[in-house]
Amino acid sequence: MGTTLAEKVWADHLVRKGSDGAPDLLYIDLMLMHEVTSPQAFEGLRLAGRKPRHVDQLIATEDHNTPTVDIDRPNPDETSALQLSTLEKNCKDFGVRLCPLGDADQGVVHAFAPVLGLTQPGMTIVCGDSHTSTHGAFGAMAIGIGTSEVEHVMATQTLSLKPFKTMAVNIEGDLPKGVTAKDIILAIIAKIGTGGGQGHVIEYRGEAIKKLSMDARMTICNMSIEAGARAGMIAPDEVTFEYLKGRPHAPEGEMWDKAVEYWKTLKTDDDAVFDKEVTINAEDLEPYVTWGTNPGQGVKISGVVPDPASFNDETERSAAERAIAYMGLKPGMRIKDIAVDTVFIGSCTNGRLEDLRVAASIMKGHHKADNIHRVLVVPASSRVRLQAEKEGLDKIFKDFGAEWRNAGCSMCLGMNPDKMVARERSISTSNRNFEGRQGKGSRTHLASPAVAAATAIRGTICSPADL
């Protein structure tokens, strides 16, 4: 019997096979770090008198607590300022490369690494952050870990893990016009639920996936965690190789040829068997938007807020009742009748260059609706910001009435100055719509950059086709 992509990468990094139910020991190729989950890990090393085993396989950036305006001024939030200064000290003390605020390579941790060519097929990648799964778009095994595990990886460059189950999600056929990667992953989560991938590595397959760009593939793998999975992966191909070629940390010359030769072996065998398999017809999809307070509570944009009574499962019914009340909606309300206050385009899910190009192409020649209080456009990395400005995208956003910001996590989460207030409603290209995610009492609808941009023009949730 053949093996899956995930099983191949796992086997290539196996240091020691666990016995009698014990976990396997895996070698870790790359660890990414940021200011929130690293302080205790560094302190653990310091107290034990240890040094990182392979400091050249660690890299850090500042993203979660960073302001996206006035970055040259002192951070007004004492806790955020402390976390950032602590990361800077720790990286200096232990010799870890840091891309700080204002650095040309700084960005959201899961956006700056791919742009630099650090993320490569067949790697094992970890970070103290749940959306590490983003890097699986390259055919890497990328896993979010806890702070104690961060310390363990720094000290040993290994990680103890029990093998994950495997799951195939097949997106067959061609996507209808206007349907994007964000719509695909929201549709998947709506279908299988936020626990549908629990304990599994999801491999995204099918013709629709093969035709996606790398930016789009990263969007899908990014939200594997919202489906409950430990990781998400897409087999590398010519699209992957073309994206990586010439990037700062990509192999060159003969090493490039050898790397591509290996990368081409990273695909699931025809006779491999997955533990679970789901198939979705791409032609049945349309833009998706969430109505509730978890990413699985999503519907087609042409749909309505569901009636809780329509859920057979008591837990789901109760969750729907609570979500509808929190979101200030009513069952049967058309999604396209929901007016929003704020539009956020950014995050490690949808703050890449392709996302910004899509948003700009829709906003060009328009101005934000009168009821829209603010539109924040936040590139996911400084390199993306620079390229967007070279293409003149920033001018389009500013003419539209949007705020063009510096790179950072921004309004994806309420840990920096870009917060919402109670009962403020946003349409957001980020990955989570939990209660209070974007600020205490905030109400979040997840959507694609295309839907977010169109909504900013009309003032109510809509797709570009509705304009």
From Swiss-Prot:
Enzyme Commission number(s) of this protein: 4.2.1.33
Protein origin, superkingdom: Bacteria
Cofactor: [4Fe-4S] cluster
Biological or metabolic pathway of the protein: Amino-acid biosynthesis; L-leucine biosynthesis; L-leucine from 3-methyl-2-oxobutanoate: step 2/4
GO biological process: L-leucine biosynthetic process
Pfam families: Aconitase
Keywords: 4Fe-4S, Amino-acid biosynthesis, Branched-chain amino acid biosynthesis, Iron, Iron-sulfur, Leucine biosynthesis, Lyase, Metal-binding
Catalytic activity: (2R,3S)-3-isopropylmalate = (2S)-2-isopropylmalate
An example Gene Ontology molecular-function term: metal ion binding
Cofactor note: Binds 1 [4Fe-4S] cluster per subunit.
Family: Belongs to the aconitase/IPM isomerase family. LeuC type 1 subfamily.
Biological role stated in the UniProt entry: Catalyzes the isomerization between 2-isopropylmalate and 3-isopropylmalate, via the formation of 2-isopropylmaleate.
Name by which UniProt lists this protein: 3-isopropylmalate dehydratase large subunit
Gene this chain is encoded by: leuC
